[in-house]
Amino acid sequence: MSVVIINTGCSNLSSIKYAICRLGYNPKISTSVRDILSANKILLPGVGSAYSAIRVLSESNLLNIIKKCQQPFLGICLGMQLLSAFSSEAQGLDLLSIINSPVYRLNSGSLPLPHNGWNNVEICRNNVLFEDIENHSKFYFLHSYSVDITKYTIAKTLYNTYFSAAIQKNNFW
């Protein structure tokens, strides 16, 4: 089984690759259209700026390729946000529009931004992504932007207000 990690130029690729290797796979880090289309599973990680990540995907001619993917596709952190339609970052930015939901600066109230730490995640509906993971398990977060709760939300967490911790539409998580 082939696993491709899309290189957005702004992520912790080594950590992701190592984690996938520990699961018994030999992932390939790539921006090659051929690699992505032939992969059995695809990961889109990201840390930092949505603007920078979208620019790399655009320069690599991957924006439309990603939208056409039929295989399981997992966006991690910023990668999940990129699946949305729009980000309020950088005075507004169009994203991949796979999930019709905006990404806004996290409403942290009096809590500090970025949100940095472990949160309990509430699973909203059964999903293969959370198979063998207990409801209210802790996950690590480091972000200033979030995806609102929508019909695509499969898990949520609270940091002043609830936001999507995981989303899913068809083969995209």
From Swiss-Prot:
Q: Which Gene Ontology CC terms are recorded? A: cytoplasm
Provide the leader sequence positions. Answer: none
Question: What GO biological process terms are annotated to this protein in UniProt?
Answer: L-histidine biosynthetic process
Which Enzyme Commission number(s) are on file for it? 4.3.2.10, 3.5.1.2
- Domain Glutamine amidotransferase type-1 span(s) in chain numbering: 2-173
What chemistry does it catalyse, as a reaction equation?
5-[(5-phospho-1-deoxy-D-ribulos-1-ylimino)methylamino]-1-(5-phospho-beta-D-ribosyl)imidazole-4-carboxamide + L-glutamine = D-erythro-1-(imidazol-4-yl)glycerol 3-phosphate + 5-amino-1-(5-phospho-beta-D-ribosyl)imidazole-4-carboxamide + L-glutamate + H(+); L-glutamine + H2O = L-glutamate + NH4(+)
Please, which domain of life does this record's source organism belong to?
Bacteria
Q: Does the keyword Cytoplasm apply?
A: yes
**Where is this chain primarily localised?**
cytoplasm
* UniProt pathway annotation: Amino-acid biosynthesis; L-histidine biosynthesis; L-histidine from 5-phospho-alpha-D-ribose 1-diphosphate: step 5/9
Q: For this UniProt entry, which segments traverse the membrane?
A: none
Catalytic residues at 77 (nucleophile)
Q: Which GO terms describe its molecular function?
A: glutaminase activity; imidazoleglycerol-phosphate synthase activity; lyase activity
**Keyword entries, A-Z:** Amino-acid biosynthesis, Cytoplasm, Glutamine amidotransferase, Histidine biosynthesis, Hydrolase, Lyase
Q: Does the keyword Protease apply?
A: no
Cellular compartments annotated: Cytoplasm
Known function: IGPS catalyzes the conversion of PRFAR and glutamine to IGP, AICAR and glutamate. The HisH subunit catalyzes the hydrolysis of glutamine to glutamate and ammonia as part of the synthesis of IGP and AICAR. The resulting ammonia molecule is channeled to the active site of HisF.
Q: Quaternary state and partners of this protein?
A: Heterodimer of HisH and HisF.
Protein name in UniProt: Imidazole glycerol phosphate synthase subunit HisH
Q: What gene name does this entry carry?
A: hisH
